[in-house]
Amino acid sequence: MWEVLVIKTLTKENIMDLPIALKTASEKLVVGYKQAQLKKIAQDLSDRYRNESGAGKVLLSKDIEAAVYALVRMPATYGAVSDALSYSLEYFNGEIKTLLDVGAGSGAATWAAQAQLPLERITCIEREGAMRRVGEALMKEGEPVLSSARWISSDLTSSKITTSADIVISSYVMNEMAKKDRQFVLDNLWAATNEMLLIVEPGTPAGF
């Protein structure tokens, strides 16, 4: 199907295989759009994130933008979180049953964590409505713990986190916010953590 070709084109540099349920759900998000349209949206998003990240701006607002973002970024994000979590768990002797995915986006970190941990409860915090809708739609296609995940609309830079979890994951979040807001957010992440705080950021000169 052409949707699969689009995914391969948009994610050609990201070789991490996604779970079948997630990959299938991702394909459904772009049904009805032509490959040229998706490539244009992907390029616009890439330019926007490259040039405007780090100021706390809203970088996408449409559901199709969030869907394309998921297609482009989820394989790499899923892979990065999977590797970081796997490595961290080698040095961890506690028990993890609850997850808080902060700045969850389309939920890649949650899917990666669920693949390695016996999670019983998942909470996702995401500011952007389009991202929340896409993330929820994707998780509805997953296992019960994913489909029953609780999604919270909140701006991390201005609101305290009012829930806690055994593991708190923040992936590709800190670098997108203004520097002045990072300490406040970090303090809140740590306060919400019962056992492990995992922060994943891009390994670039401009990264956090």
Q: What positions do the PLM features span?
A:
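N-terminal auxiliary segments of SAM/dcSAM-dependent transferases
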Residues: 10-56
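Class I SAM-dependent methyltransferase Rossmann-like catalytic core
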Residues: 57, 61-83
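Conserved class I S-adenosyl-L-methionine
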Residues: 95-105
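Conserved SAM-binding loop of SAM-dependent methyltransferases across substrates and taxa
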Residues: 106-119
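S-adenosyl-L-methionine
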Residues: 136-161
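A short SAM/SAH-binding and catalytic strip from SAM-dependent methyltransferases
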Residues: 166-180
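Conserved beta-strand signature within the Rossmann-like core of class I S-adenosyl-L-methionine
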Residues: 194-203
